[in-house]
Amino acid sequence: DHAGTVSKAHKQHDVNSVLYKVYEDI
């Protein structure tokens, strides 16, 4: 399912962005 793959990748990107912001704050 292409749409599901894109959605999953987008969610993973969001998680990585949040983690990156957290590490920047440290």
Swiss-Prot record:
Hemolymph. Keywords: Copper, Oxygen transport, Secreted, Transport. GO terms for cellular component: extracellular region. It is found in: Secreted, Extracellular space. GO terms for molecular function: oxygen carrier activity. It comes from the Eukaryota. Hemocyanins are copper-containing oxygen carriers occurring freely dissolved in the hemolymph of many mollusks and arthropods. Belongs to the tyrosinase family. Hemocyanin subfamily. This is Hemocyanin subunit 5.
